[in-house]
From Swiss-Prot:
The keyword Transmembrane helix applies. Keywords: Membrane, Nucleus, Repeat, Ribonucleoprotein, Ribosome biogenesis, rRNA processing, Transmembrane, Transmembrane helix. HEAT repeats lie at residues 581-619, 1038-1076, 1110-1148, 1244-1282, 1288-1327, 1756-1794. Pfam families: BP28CT, HEAT, HEAT_HEATR1, U3snoRNP10. It is a multi-pass membrane protein. The chain crosses the membrane at residues 102-122, 136-156, 939-959, 995-1015. This is U3 small nucleolar RNA-associated protein 10. The keyword Aminoacyl-tRNA synthetase does not apply. Component of the ribosomal small subunit (SSU) processome. One of its GO terms (biological process) is positive regulation of transcription by RNA polymerase I.
Length: 1801
């Protein structure tokens, strides 16, 4: 044993209390997010839950997803959940719920409800300790806010490694800075990983929010960039390895992020990371492709713009501009990808992406099924998004693709590619780049030209080389392009019978043109082609087949090379001699079309052909027109020109312009326009008017009769430049074409597009352009094409017609606009469902309608309503019916619907036509408003939309008029009553607001017309508009108040009316609306109203009306306080004086202004007394909570001019309040409220002024007033005591007044109030002058106070004395004798049977608590004895007494009173404590325990004798109670008391050393075993108590006191031989013995029980208790108590010999006694030692199992001895025994690792 038992005991004590460290628990409980540590520490979980649950409920209203947590972490059950008591699985489940909630609440942490809800997680579940990482990450996006600083303050010191960066900021109590977080992310990859995992988890839960994702995106982007920068190295392989590590860390995050497409901010953040990776790391091409595919696969409409930037940056890093197929297809699917790329190209490089798109567009040209790719390609070059170098690369891609296609592409694809290549050479910006590409590349242009059947213009080419190359190409292509077979097939065709221009679909033409395209590049092939019989070349001069074929080719949608070849063929034909007598004017329209072709090569061919025709014409004299009757078919009649006219046209209008046309495709249009308009009269070259007319009609007739649309489109393009010529117009001449086009069906139009490849929309626009705005009936003509409507009309044509009308509308004179508008309106109001209605309406909305049109429309509304008026019910029925619409038939309803639609459309047109520009509409808008009101009453409909439109138009006109010096319209037409009706009768907020704004505007322009009907407006505002919280409604209210109220007040003043009563309805409207006005707008709104009305005149009225209507509603009181806070002191006091006048007026028999403002005396008014009480309570609140006190003090200190007025107003208010109080003494509510006002009024005074005032009031005879005044003083002292010297001195002087009241007043309540004031003064100022308070204490302790019969004054006096003791300390000693005697007498009185006074009882114990703390030495032994006896009586009382005060007093006694005095008193009164019962005994033992704990060791040693005496008496309690006939303790009480005694004894032992304690222990052993043998029951009781103590003794002090067991071995053996669990008298002792032994064995570290002398004595008696297992019940007891004890003994024995001895005894119980024991052993072991009973054998087997489990192989060393027993037991007759032995065998096999079968056989 150690030399210093005390030191070792102290160490054990320290270790044993760690788990019960109450201080640490209180500290943990005080960790709060929103409360101060001190406040938080005082809160219980019920209080916390109520606060936090309110926040949680608000969250549920914000987001329904929070509701799921109401059943778990916010349930009532959660208040008692302690995670320290949960197992691992339960904690894991709880963590998942907590993290789900934190994730969801993260987005709302700046809202107060969210912080409250999280507070519950912190206080109840301590998430900041158990879920630290997740909690910090939830708050981290708000790292710069105060709430994050609050979190830092409560976090544990040891933060997760990923978040160590926060530790310095936690220590310094400052917010972290962003740069620190970024730097840590760079250097600490754990932070990046942790943050990524958190963000992904939150997003999967769909709890993401902007703050989190914005924070995450910024941190991870900067972090990854910094990581990549910091990993740069001079060694490339090292740097690459580091970069690869970073990429591998980030890619899984990107993969998970891209998968959540709907979380747009997360996806955009991933795009940002991709950009960083692309720019900072050298990514492999496959990685770039993978990232691009991931980006395009993840984008949505919302993220597409950001994704496109990301793809552009990634593509920029690729060495080759080749896009993955998925990326290219995704780009194609985008809406207008080039526009989006153009938008981002200003900030990001897009060249590689664009080049990738080019490469994708020209990839696999032969397999492309549509034109989308080539259209995109064409747009790319036109958009010029690439610089010259990149444009050159793009051109190279196209040219390489074009040179590689051969003859495998379709004609359409060939044409589109040819157009693109031609654009390269035609475009002024692209041509230089194209030229450079050709010069620098090895691309064979001839191959491209051949493949595309075009000629690339403006590129100088050596003709000889070109011819040779073309020949070579021809030779090489001969075998592969199919030309020969096609030509051979066509050679078999017979001659075509008519012109190739007669029809769209001619099968043989399609074959011919394909073959001609193949031959166009070879003169030999062309020569062979023209000789085909089907072309009838031999009859070309007389029949149209030959030339018509080539005309159709060069005017169709074919490659330029093919067109040029056709023109060349024509040119060569017509220049031959055979054509010298032929008039070929039929070719002129087509040649003009060719001159306008975009291809210079085609234009050149046309120029050459026309030049040849011009040469032929010169030689002609008179000849017939070629193909005159057969060009378009037999039925076509063209007004052909005469040969001379044709010659003039050529010579004057065409041939001179040819060379210009060769270089400029637009020139022919200008030339033709000039020619047809006519030149100067003196010009020899001018074309005369008749010829112009003939030429114009000639061209127009071709445009009309030409069956083909491609050449017709070209001709129209030229003709639409000319409005009129030679007295006719193009509209007139081309009208047949317009009608033809109109009559075509959708299918026919589709065929045109399919066969001729023209744009239908462009052609349709050209056709409709034939109608010019200069045409007189142009709009009527256009309308005639769609009216009457036919279902066969194409919708696109109808839409185009109305678009054309819209285009020419502004160029048409106003009179025609008016006429057209009427027709359009008729169309728009038709009942049919034709598209004409919608198109007409849309047109009317788009065009600018003149004022007369709008006026005409408006005039139709009243007339229409009058017409339909007859549909309504009869007048009588209208007055009585609740639903007038019932009277209408279905037909009537249809008419009504039509009328509503018509009116809506008219008003929409007016509203959309800038009505402010048409003030002439004002009268008819008001007429319309009147008609709508009338109609509304008839059909029982609100018609809000119509009213809104009408009012909106009027408002626009009025607002424009307000800006001018005088109204722009006749104000006599204004109908303010109608506008007010709109305000009152509609439910539409839009209508209400617009009407209010209109009233406000009219009140400026014409106030005399508005103000007489303004009051209903404010009534309406109160019930409707004031409730709104949108910015528009706020603006409406502001304008209404600003503009209407001043005008109203001015009007009342002019009429010499009282302005307050005159505006009562207005005030009532606003006050009635208070509860509906959004809270944050109330103060601003009422402040604006009062300011406009006049604060001094109206503030009191508004306050009174609010108080009358809402009484003490907190929100109203706050508003009232805010309203008075802006007024100065004089205005505020004046307002209160008027307010009190109004209260007085309300209490008169004949009220005045209060009847108007408050409804006093009216039928529906409230009782005057209730109104007065409410008003006074509100006024009291204002006095207490306004800033009046500060205002008065400031004004009086500075002695301003208002000082005297303030004093006068204050005096007047005081007199008013006192007068109301005196006159209303019989009306308690009003009298009390007046007292509250008085209290509030006094609160505005300084302390000295206040005391002077109440001292004067105390001299009044009215006791009620005096009590009220003292109550005010007590309240003031409690709330805000003054600390200046003068105030303190004046307050102490006032004690004499109060003492005098206590001594002399017969009024108990007044005395009570005086004592309360004495108490408060003592508490606040007593230490300044203790002597003055001492005299007061003596009075309070005298018969005048606590000596009275009234319990109220007694209780208050005793509590006052307690306060005096705390404040005065020793100065209280003179009063103590009387205080002690009277207080103990009162305590005894409070405990009288059937007269228990709990409050008095508590007050006395409170007094003694103060005495024990401050004057413990002044409480004598006799007083202490008396107090203890009374406290025992209190504890034993059955009455409902509060134990807390009594127990607190006893605790203070134990801690503060001298230990000797206290213990002596307890020892003297121990018997009374026991007699009083368990509660008293418990409390006195608590006192002893606290005394030992709080006093030093020396005090314990000094009082050891008396302490031991008390403990021995306490230990003997069980014996006394068991032998007593009237026991007050039941078994549970005894066990609880003994547990407490054991705890006290252990605490005493901690204060002793071995020398002091060992004698006490020996004495205790003697005491326990020293009773005479005949006192069996007493001996059993003492041993039970003693062994229960020893169990705690060995369990607490452990190995230090194991040696003390030597004193008890003999006693224990004796008990083991006699005690039995089946004997009720010894069962308790048996249980105590087993548990004590187990505790002693368990903590043996000094080999005490290994000693044979010790173990031999105890082992056999202990093991023999297995014999008591004879039934299921006793077997269970033995299993839970005896077997563990035997096991612990075996563990402590720890030697083979000892184990063998134990096993020998144990195995006897595995067999029946006859089989297991010899006669000698049986004799030695005693009777019944064996396993006769199966339950005994089972118990022995369970013991073996326990020993095997705890000792393992050490125990199984005895297996050879056990095997015979095991074999026998496996064949035991009892199934239970057999089952247990098999379990043991399995256990043995598990330990040994081998089976026992061989050993058992």
């Amino acid at each position: 044993m150690a030399s210093s038992l005390a030191a070792q005991l102290s160490q054990i004590a320290a270790n044993s209390t760690n788990q019960l460290n109450l201080k640490a628990q209180r500290l943990a409980h005080s960790k709060s997010l929103i409360f101060d540590k001190r406040v938080a520490g005082s809160q219980d979980f019920d209080t916390i839950y109520d606060i936090c649950y309110d926040g949680f409920r608000e969250l549920c209203q914000l987001d329904f997803r929070f509701a799921q947590f109401e059943r778990s972490i916010f349930s009532e059950q959660s208040k008692v959940q302690d995670r320290t008591e949960m197992n691992v699985e339960q904690n894991r489940e709880l963590d998942s719920v907590l993290e789900a909630f934190l994730a969801l609440v993260g987005g709302r942490l700046l809202l107060s409800p969210a912080v409250k809800a999280v507070e519950w997680l912190i206080r109840r579940f301590r998430v900041h300790e158990y879920n630290t990482r997740f909690t910090i990450l939830t708050f981290l996006p708000y790292y710069s806010t105060p709430v994050f600083l609050n979190l830092l303050a409560i976090l544990p010191d040891d933060l997760p490694s990923a978040l160590k960066v926060l530790i310095p900021y936690k220590r310094s109590a400052i917010n972290p800075v962003r740069q620190a977080l970024v730097q840590n992310a760079i250097s600490n990859r754990d932070l990046i990983t942790t943050l990524n995992n958190y963000v992904l988890q939150v997003c999967r839960q769909r709890a993401h929010h902007h703050a989190l994702l914005a924070f995450w995106a910024g941190i991870i982007t900067e972090g990854v960039a910094g990581m990549l920068d910091s990993s740069r190295s001079g060694r490339r392989n090292v740097e690459k390895q580091k970069h690869d590590d970073i990429i591998l860390q980030i890619l899984p995050v990107l993969n998970d992020g891209f998968a959540m497409k709907d979380v747009s901010e997360l996806v955009i953040g991933c795009y940002m990371v991709c950009v960083v990776l692309a720019q900072k790391a050298e990514l492999q091409d496959r990685v770039l492709d993978g990232l691009m595919e991931a980006v395009t696969g993840s984008w949505t409409e919302e993220t597409m713009s950001s994704g496109l930037i990301c793809v552009a940056v990634l593509a920029q890093q690729k060495p080759d501009p080749i896009l993955p197929k998925r990326v290219f297809k995704a780009m194609l699917r985008m809406k207008d990808p080039l526009k989006q790329l153009a938008d981002i190209s200003t900030e990001y490089k897009t060249s590689q992406l664009l080049l990738g798109l080019v490469a994708g567009c020209v990839d696999s040209l032969s397999t492309q099924k549509d034109s989308a790719r080539l259209e995109l390609l064409s747009s790319m070059f036109k958009s010029q998004l690439l610089n010259d170098a990149d444009t050159a690369k793009a051109m190279t891609f196209v040219l390489q693709a074009a040179s590689a296609v051969g003859g495998t592409i379709s004609l359409d694809t060939q044409t589109q590619i040819a157009e693109i290549v031609q654009h390269f050479s035609r475009s002024s910006s692209l041509q230089p780049v194209f030229q450079k590409v050709i010069d620098e590349s090895s691309i064979d242009l001839s191959v491209i030209e051949y493949n595309l059947q075009t000629v690339i213009e403006s590129v100088p080419v050596n003709k000889a080389i070109e011819d040779v190359e073309m020949e070579d190409a021809d030779k090489t292509e001969t075998a592969t392009d199919g030309y020969d077979s096609a030509l051979e097939s066509l050679a078999k065709e017979s001659s075509f019978s008519t012109s190739f221009l007669t029809a769209q679909s001619i099968p043989v033409f399609d074959k011919l043109v394909q073959t001609f395209a193949l031959s166009a590049g070879s003169p030999e092939r062309v020569s062979a082609f023209v000789e085909l019989p089907v072309l009838c070349k031999a009859n070309a001069t007389t029949s149209p087949q030959f030339l018509s074929f080539f005309v159709r080719v060069f005017t169709g949608m074919y490659p330029a090379g093919v067109k040029a070849a056709a023109l060349k063929t024509i040119s060569s034909i017509v220049s031959s001699a055979a054509w010298s007598d032929v008039d070929v004017q039929a070719l002129l329209p087509f040649m003009l079309i060719a001159l306008a072709d975009p291809s210079e090569r085609v234009r050149s061919g046309a120029v050459d052909a026309l030049a040849n025709i011009g040469k032929v014409v010169d030689k002609k004299k008179k000849s017939g027109v070629w193909a005159r009757d057969s060009l378009y078919g037999k039925s076509m009649h063209i007004p052909w020109l005469s040969s001379s006219d044709f010659q003039k046209i050529l010579e004057r209008a065409v041939l001179p312009e040819l060379e210009e046309c060769r270089s400029d495709g637009e020139h022919i249009g200008r030339a033709l326009e000039n020619a047809l308009r006519g030149a100067a009269s003196d010009s020899a070259s001018a074309i005369k008017k008749p010829l112009r007319l003939a030429f114009f009609t000639y061209l127009c007739s071709h445009a009309v009769h030409l069956p083909l649309f491609a050449p017709r489109a070209g001709l129209l393009n030229l003709l639409n430049r000319v409005d009129k010529a030679g007295g006719t117009t193009r509209t007139k001449e081309l009208e047949p074409l317009l009608k033809k086009w109109r009559d075509m069906s959708e299918q026919e139009v589709a065929e045109v597009h399919e066969k001729e490849q023209i744009s239908v929309s462009d052609f349709e626009a050209q056709v409709l352009k034939t109608v010019t705005p200069k045409e007189k009936d142009s709009i009527n003509l256009l309308l005639s094409t769609v009216t009457p409507y036919s279902p066969s009309l194409r919708a696109s044509f109808v839409s185009s017609v109305f678009n054309r009308i819209s285009e020419i509308w502004g160029k048409v004179p106003e009179d025609r606009q008016i006429t057209a508008a009427e027709k359009l309106f008729e169309l728009s109001t038709q009942a049919s469902e034709s598209p004409l209605v919608d198109n007409a309406r849309d047109l009317l909305r788009r065009v600018e309608l003149p004022g007369p049109v709008l006026l005409n429309y408006l005039q139709q509304i009243p007339a229409s309503i009058t017409d339909i008026d007859s549909l309504g019910p009869a007048p009588k029925r209208r007055r009585t019916s609740q639903n007038n619409m019932v009277a209408m038939t279905t037909k009537d309803e249809a008419k009504l619907s039509k009328l509503m639609d018509k009116m809506t459309f008219i008003l929409e047109l007016v509203d959309g036509s800038s009505p402010e520009a048409h003030p002439e509409l004002t009268e008819w808008l008001f007429q319309t408003l009147a008609a709508l009101h009338h109609f509304k009453s008839q059909i029982q409909s609100g018609m809000s939309y119509l009213l809104s439109l009408t009012l909106g138009s009027l408002l626009a006109i009025v607002n424009r008029s307000r800006a001018s010096s005088k109204p722009q319209f006749d104000t006599s037409v204004v109908r303010a009553d109608l506008v007010v009706d709109c305000v009152r009768t509609t439910e539409s907020p839009q209508v209400q607001n617009t009407a209010l704004l209109l009233v406000a505007g009219l009140s400026v322009i014409a106030p005399e017309l508005v103000l007489h009907s303004v009051m209903p407006i404010f009534t309406f505002m109160g019930s409707s508009v004031l409730r709104k919280d949108d910015d528009y409604s706020v603006s409406v209210i502001d304008q209404t108040i600003d503009q209407v109220v001043p005008a109203l007040i001015q009007s009342l003043r002019h009429q010499k009316r009282d302005v307050v009563s005159g505006t009562s309805e207005l005030l009532l409207s606003f006050t009635a609306a208070f509860e509906h006005i959004p809270s944050h707008r109330r103060l601003r709104l009422f402040h604006a109203l009062i300011t406009k009305l006049g604060t001094e005149e109206f503030l009191f009225a508004v306050l009174a009306m609010l108080a009358n209507r809402y009484s003490m509603d907190k929100a109203v009181l706050v508003l009232m306080t805010g309203l008075v806070s802006d007024a100065d002191a004089t205005v505020e006091l004046s307002t209160y004086s008027k307010f009190l006048n109004l209260v007085g007026d309300s209490l008169k028999s004949k009220p005045g202004i209060s009847q108007v403002l408050l409804g006093i005396g009216s039928d529906d008014g409230r009782e005057p007394h209730k109104v007065a009480a409410d008003l006074l309570r509100a006024l009291a609140y204002l006095f207490k909570h306004s800033s009046l006190k500060v205002k008065i003090a400031r004004a009086l200190t500075t002695e301003t001019d208002d000082s005297e007025r303030i004093r006068a107003l204050f005096s007047n208010i005081l007199e008013q309040v006192l007068a109301i109080g005196e006159s209303m003494q019989s009306v308690k509510p009003v009298h009390q409220a007046a007292g509250d006002v008085l209290s509030g009024l006094f609160s505005t005074l300084t302390t000295i002024d206040f005391l002077d005032t109440i001292e004067a009031l105390l001299k009044r005879p009215d006791d009620a007033l005096r009590r009220k005044v003292l109550s005010l003083l007590a309240t003031r002292l409690q709330q805000s005591p003054e600390r200046d010297g003068a105030s303190q001195t004046r307050m102490l002087d006032f004690l004499t007044v109060l003492v005098d009241i206590v001594q002399s007043s017969p009024d108990i309540l007044l005395k009570h109030a005086a004592v309360t004031c004495i108490d408060r003064i003592t508490e606040k100022y007593g230490k300044k002058e203790p002597s003055m308070v001492t005299s007061a204490a003596q009075v309070v302790a005298s018969a005048s106070c606590i000596g009275q019969e009234d319990d109220r004054i007694r209780i208050n006096g005793v509590l006052c004395l307690a306060s005096m003791v705390e404040v005065l300390g020793q100065a209280m000693i003179p009063a103590l004798p009387e205080v002690l005697n009277r207080s103990l007498a009162l305590l005894e009185l409070s405990l009288e049977t059937n007269k228990v006074n709990a409050r008095l009882h508590d007050a006395v114990f409170t007094l003694f608590s103060a005495l024990f703390v401050h004057l413990p030495y002044m409480v004598s032994a006799s007083h202490l004895d008396r107090l203890l006896v009374l406290s025992f009586k209190s504890a034993a009382s059955d009455e409902d007494l509060d134990n807390e005060n009594r127990q607190e007093a006893l605790h203070f006694m134990a801690r503060k009173v001298d230990m000797a005095v206290a213990l002596a008193s307890i020892e003297r009164n121990w018997t009374q404590a026991v007699s009083a019962g368990p509660s008293a005994t418990h409390e006195v033992l608590d006192a002893i325990s606290l005394s030992i704990e709080k006093h030093p060791k020396s005090a314990t040693m000094k009082n050891l004798s008396v302490l031991t005496t008390i403990l021995f008496r306490a230990f003997d309690l069980r014996r006394e109670q068991t032998q007593s006939s009237e026991s007050a303790f039941d078994a549970s009480d005894l066990e609880e008391i003994e547990d407490l005694i054991n705890d006290v004894t252990i605490k005493m032992i901690y204060k002793l050393n071995d020398t002091a304690f060992r004698p006490i222990f020996i004495k205790l052993v003697e005491w326990a075993t020293g009773l005479p043998e005949k006192n069996t029951q007493g001996g059993l009781a003492r041993l039970t108590t003693f062994y229960r103590f020893l169990q705690v003794f060995f369990g607490t002090l452990q190995s230090i006191v194991t040696g003390y067991a030597s004193y008890i071995i003999e006693s224990v053996v004796s008990v083991l031989e006699t005690a039995s669990p089946s004997n009720p008298n010894t069962k308790s002792l048996w249980l105590a013995t087993m548990r004590m032994l187990r505790s002693a064995f368990e903590h043996d570290q000094d080999e005490f029980w290994q000693s044979p002398s010790h173990i031999t004595k105890i082992s056999t008696p202990l093991i023999s208790h297995l014999r008591h297992a004879t039934s299921t019940t006793t077997g269970a007891l033995v299993a839970t108590e005896t077997i563990p004890t035997i096991t612990e003994l075996a563990v402590a024995a720890d030697s083979t010999d000892n184990h063998k001895e134990l096993n020998t005894v144990l195995m006897r119980f595995l067999r029946p006694s006859s089989a297991s024991l010899s006669s000698s052993s049986t004799k030695r072991a005693g009777p019944g030692l064996g396993g006769d009973n199966p339950q005994t054998r089972i118990a022995a087997l369970k013991t073996e199992q326990a020993l095997t489990e705890h000792l393992g192989e050490d125990w199984l060393a005895l297996l050879p001895e056990m095997l015979p027993y095991i074999s026998e037991l496996m064949e035991d007759e009892d199934e239970g025994v057999e089952r247990e032995v098999r379990k043991w065998v399995k256990q043995i096999e598990g330990v040994l690792g081998e089976r026992l079968d061989d050993m058992l056989t």
